[in-house]
């Protein structure tokens, strides 16, 4: 399990709680397993997952063992990264999220030490964790904290799973230096 900086402590949970999660096995099969609800620290919030999209570029490749950088030792793993959830508990330093907020990109990035699973972001789990970048000491927030945010009340959580895909498309446009009015050629007819 990841170690926290000395100034950040875990939220103490009186008893172990369990949840269900979708797992990709070493053979590429899917199964539902019962695992511990993720622990969180004082700079994070516990989130009840509401919905999660299926990403052809990530989830399908993880299922078929073709995702770059995920070798056989990465399995079994919890699947899903295009998730939206609702905050149910917050750590003591959290100020950007409150109970009841719908949030983008909650993950299960840490798996309890007694579980054999690895994380494929865990969006198809019953619970996940979101980081509050503002709660961490300067320079110590995980990178994902800057992509996680409160969902505006006017946006349906199911529709919001597409925001994550849109963000990836906008990122590609930025990386390739495309500007408004330019012509581009798109090869293939993938989902994005």
Can you say where each PLM-predicted feature lies in the sequence?
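NAD(P)H dinucleotide-binding glycine-rich loop of Rossmann-like/cofactor-binding domains
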Residues: 110-184
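Glycine-rich beta-strand-centered segment in the early N-terminal region that forms part
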Residues: 38-53, 66-109, 120-122
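Short, Lys/Arg-enriched N-terminal segments with co-localized hydrophobic residues
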Residues: 7-18
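Cytochrome P450 core scaffold surrounding the K-helix E-X-X-R motif
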Residues: 57-63
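Residues located in well-ordered beta-strands
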Residues: 20, 31, 36, 48, ...
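Glycine-rich NAD(P) Rossmann-fold beta1-alpha1 loop
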Residues: 190-191
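Residues that mark the start of a beta-strand
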Residues: 20, 44-46, 183
């Amino acid at each position: 399990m990841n170690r926290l900086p000395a100034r950040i402590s875990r939220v103490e949970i009186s008893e172990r709680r369990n949840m269900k999660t979708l797992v990709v096995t070493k053979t590429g099969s899917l199964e539902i397993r019962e695992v511990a609800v993720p622990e969180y620290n004082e700079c994070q919030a516990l989130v009840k997952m509401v919905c999660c999209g299926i990403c052809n570029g990530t989830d399908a490749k993880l299922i078929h063992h073709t995702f770059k950088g995920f070798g056989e030792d990465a399995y079994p793993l919890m699947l899903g990264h295009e998730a939206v959830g609702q905050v149910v508990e917050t750590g003591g330093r959290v100020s950007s999220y409150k109970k009841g907020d719908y949030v983008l990109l909650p993950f299960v990035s840490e798996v309890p030490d007694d579980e054999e699973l690895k994380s494929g972001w865990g969006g198809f789990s019953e619970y996940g964790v979101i980081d509050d970048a503002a709660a961490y000491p300067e320079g110590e927030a995980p990178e994902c904290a800057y992509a996680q945010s409160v969902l505006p009340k006017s946006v349906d959580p199911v529709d919001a799973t597409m925001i994550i895909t849109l963000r990836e498309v906008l990122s590609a446009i930025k990386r390739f230096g495309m500007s408004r009015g330019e012509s581009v050629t798109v090869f293939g007819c993938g989902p994005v």
